[in-house]
UniProtKB/Swiss-Prot annotation:
GO terms for biological process: photosynthesis, light reaction; respiratory electron transport chain. Binds 1 heme c group covalently per subunit. Belongs to the cytochrome c family. PsbV subfamily. One of its GO terms (cellular component) is plasma membrane-derived thylakoid membrane. GO terms for molecular function: electron transfer activity; heme binding; iron ion binding. Its cofactor is heme c. Gene3D superfamilies: Cytochrome c-like domain (1.10.760.10). One of the extrinsic, lumenal subunits of photosystem II (PSII). PSII is a light-driven water plastoquinone oxidoreductase, using light energy to abstract electrons from H(2)O, generating a proton gradient subsequently used for ATP formation. The extrinsic proteins stabilize the structure of photosystem II oxygen-evolving complex (OEC), the ion environment of oxygen evolution and protect the OEC against heat-induced inactivation. Low-potential cytochrome c that plays a role in the OEC of PSII. Residues 1-33 form the signal peptide. PROSITE patterns: CYTC (PS51007). Heme c binds at C70, C73, H74, M137. It comes from Synechococcus sp. (strain CC9902). The lineage of its organism: Bacteria, Bacillati, Cyanobacteriota, Cyanophyceae, Synechococcales. The gene is psbV. Pfam families: Cytochrom_C550 (PF14495). This is Photosystem II extrinsic protein V.
Amino acid sequence: MVSVFSSLRQSFKGLLVLVPVLIGLAFISPAEAVQWDAETLTVPVNPDGAEVTFTDREINAGRKVFNTSCGTCHAGGITKTNQNVGLDPETLALATPARDNVDALVDYMKDPTSYDGEYSISDVHPSMRSAELYPAMRDLDDEDLRLMAGYILVSPKVQGSSWGGGKIYF
């Protein structure tokens, strides 16, 4: 009987040590634990081939603004209202005009056009032009848009094909 209680007491002591460690690990997200290299953080800034290297802090700030302003419809780089048009690199590159660089994405967030570039969709897609309809866009400035564009372009390098890949990856 004594050995049973002794054994239980030892197990309980082990749990007391393990629980704080597990709780601490629960609050460390992969984004906070990883330091990305310059190649991962470097993306095209314009169609001419110029590049910009974002910092970890800028990408995390862009992620926060993106999740707050765009994440409801574009979580994971998908487009909930149109599964055929996501935020993956191939889809962005094939748009007209191509939206695979920071300047083009910022321009799109200011005044979005259809995928073929033929007409404005600012009346149905959140943008700076339609900020009165979409409150999440009201307080954004050019720097916020630049940071979101950086996050969108860096995400596929970090998340691979799951960024913009749709529900098969969730």
